[in-house]
Structures are given as C-alpha cells and as structure tokens.
C-alpha cells in the first residue's frame, strides 16, 4: 500500500498544535511522511479553527486553496479536521464534495485510517513537535465544563476531561528527552485540573511533580478565575523553575456583563483574587484577556472596564471584539454594539494598556534578567523572560558581543532600554 506524503497545516491555538503533533507521531509510526511544502505532498490535511469569525474565514480560505491544488492535480487527497469540521461538517460536505473526509476533534483513529495509518494506544504520549525544539505545550485536559455564553468550545470539545497525571508525566519525560526546556501547561481551563479524576483539584501537585523534572521553565496558561487554586501561587514562590507568571483571562469586570457572560464571578471577587495573588507572590506577572462589545455593553460599562484596567495594571493584556458566534449561547442576545464601535473600544483599551505596559517595562531598565533565546538574527538574539509566554508576550532584543549564543540557551541579559512590548539590552553571560 502506498504511503502518503502529507502537508499538514495546523491553524488556531496551541491546543490545536498539540492535536496536530499527536497525529504526526501516530502517522509517522505507520510510515507516513510529512513535508513543509504543499506542492510536494500528495495529501493535504488541514487542522481547522472555528472559534471566532476571523478564524473560520482563515480556515475556509485554506480549505479552498487546498481544493484548488487537488483540482489542478497537484495533490490527490484533501482532509479537514478540527473545530470547524466539528461545527460545520454537514454543510461543508454538501458545499465541498472535493474534500475526501471531514473529521471532528475526537476522531483521530478514523482520520489516521483514512490516510493509510493505524492508531496505536501505546503511542498516545508521543508527539512530533511543530514548535521550536526548546519550547513545547502540555495539554493537561480536554473540553470545558464552564458555560460562558460567548463561547462554543463546550459544543466543539465536549465536557472537561483531565488527563491522568501519570500519563502527563510520561509525556513530559518524552518532551524532555527531545530537548524541551520550557513547558507550557494548557487546557481550556487549567484551574480545575484533576477534579473529575481525583475528586479534588490537583494542579499544584501536577506542577510540583513536573518541577521535579529538569525543565528550566514551567508556565501556567489559560487559568479560570473561578475556583482558581491559590496554592499554585505558593508553588511558584517555592519552586525556581515554575515561572512567576499567570495567564488568567477575565473577559470583563462589570457585574451585569459578567452575569450575562455566565462567568460565575463578580467584580469584587475578581479584585479580591488579584490582590490575594499579588500579595502571595509580589514577583508574579499577570496576563489577562478582555472582551469588548458584548451584547448590551454600554459606554458606561466600557468606561468601567477601562478604569478597572487602569487600577489593576495588568502586565500583559490581550483584547478581542465580541464575535456573534451562532453556536454560542449569547447568539440568542441582540448584537447591539456595531462592529465599528467594537473595534474603536478595542483600540482605545489597547492604547491604555500600551501606556501601562510601557511604564511596567521601564522598571526592568538597569536590571539583569534571565532570558531564553528563541532566535538569532545576525548579532542580535531575540529572547523572552520568565514573564513572557511564547508568541503572545514581550520579546527582548539583545546584542551578543563576543559571546557565542544559540537558540534554546538560557542567558543573563542587562536591560538598557524598553518600550511597551520590547526590552533591549546586552547578553552578559551564557548559562547553558
């Protein structure tokens, strides 16, 4: 039987990336090869994102481009997997008969069979990395039990399912053998890890067990404010290789909007949580995400959010305009804020955050920081501090002088200048 040469395009979030890496490891074990150029492949496989409208449009555009290559005879097979396929399989099957198969988020064995590979249980922990070799993600759970009204993830990914701790430790050990030095923990909701399996949250225990391994940085992403286990913050202080960093998407602060979003938390409770976290670990840096233009959001409610951000002074912040997603519960509400107004509010909020970020970064000037080198361009090393997650946060641009520096190395850097989203300086020592 002919073994396919596959071009895999993985779109969307880091959770999707992990799914693609699992698929690749399974397929390669069956003799499938992968290429980075679509024109050299005989099969195209697209792992889609369907979370917001822009992501859907990108996924559809890539699907149509793949269909065109099939029509031209460049490739013989096109398969679609992931979130968009989970939501719109019936519609896409009718509109795109050229596609050889559609597979949802929980159909890896069937997808492998379609491309001439076999799923093997013993390879579940194995992944072929799509990230730089020194960085990886550990997906500690699937699905989501929250009922945020703006979100379709529970419909796409199903109920919350923690991965067994021993399995995660085996997977982490394999990543360590591959040379991964920074491990980023992800899930739709990392806060309640383990509750479904062990009857109690086990996130701190997992972090400590991972900390006993040889990763230099372990980072926690996608924590949910309700039910967040504060003992995790203590672990950050106690364990040198658990980053003093927390990604805690809040979405909003106004109580009426939080109720309409079904977030399960109030503004007062949110402020208390943030104050408690910072008091327990003064060195922590907080990242959050805000959603503007939610149905019914008034100018006064948006101004309240702006004041909240100015008061809380988040170290890292992303902001998105509300997307009226037909598969989300909030689709039943009237989308009252015009698209132009949503974008104006997003820009206004990010302008405020830029000012805050610039002032926060000035505190690093004159200091020496440990950084991880992600990239080398000439005599400039592009790096991150422990306070910066891959892809979404600040970067450091550092001169190397006479020092020989490679990607994936930890170094000491003297910071001389800063801006809102960058630090500039010089590498003073290579720490290996």
Swiss-Prot record:
The keyword 4Fe-4S applies. Keywords: 4Fe-4S, Cytoplasm, Iron, Iron-sulfur, Metal-binding, S-adenosyl-L-methionine, Transferase. Signal peptide: none annotated. Its cofactor is [4Fe-4S] cluster. Residues 4-120 form the MTTase N-terminal domain. One of its GO terms (biological process) is tRNA modification. HAMAP family: MTTase_RimO. Belongs to the methylthiotransferase family. RimO subfamily. This is Ribosomal protein uS12 methylthiotransferase RimO. The lineage of its organism: Bacteria, Pseudomonadati, Chlorobiota, Chlorobiia, Chlorobiales. The gene is rimO.
